[in-house]
Amino acid sequence: DLGRSLKQLAQQQGVTLFMLLLASFQTLLHRYSGQPEIRVGVPIANRTRVETERLIGFFVNTQVLKADFDLETRFDALLQQVKRTALEAQAHQDLPFEQLVEALQPQRSLSHSPLFQVMYNHQNAGQGKALELPGLRVEALERASATAQFDLTLDTYESGDALSASL
């Protein structure tokens, strides 16, 4: 099974499945675009403060994770680069995306996001899987979006050994 094999590879390389899939996606983007720097937006739960842990609400922040490629970049080295980048980004997950944009002052355009045009979202639960709580049943609803926020969005869903994706 592909999901199990990818998890085993991630474990052998000392990375998470998220990191392995992100590195693979960034490699694909690099191969198609030829760009030596690939930046991908990644949503993060942003619930590091004790006072928000028990609140119901949308506290998601966006991080920008960059991978650098050259002619000699091996995939195992890229995995370690992505691991370092992801772990270092965790230390700054409380920095609001808007403040990051203000500090970096990139060239702005109404046609695209200022720091990245590709989003990657990995979820550790089954897609559409119902959640049961005492006296409460929660179920994910499919939401059709008529507009695209980014040029490309990859969503991956991990449930047990199963792995699914949508682009």
Predicted regions, residues:
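Adenylate-forming
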Residues: 1-167
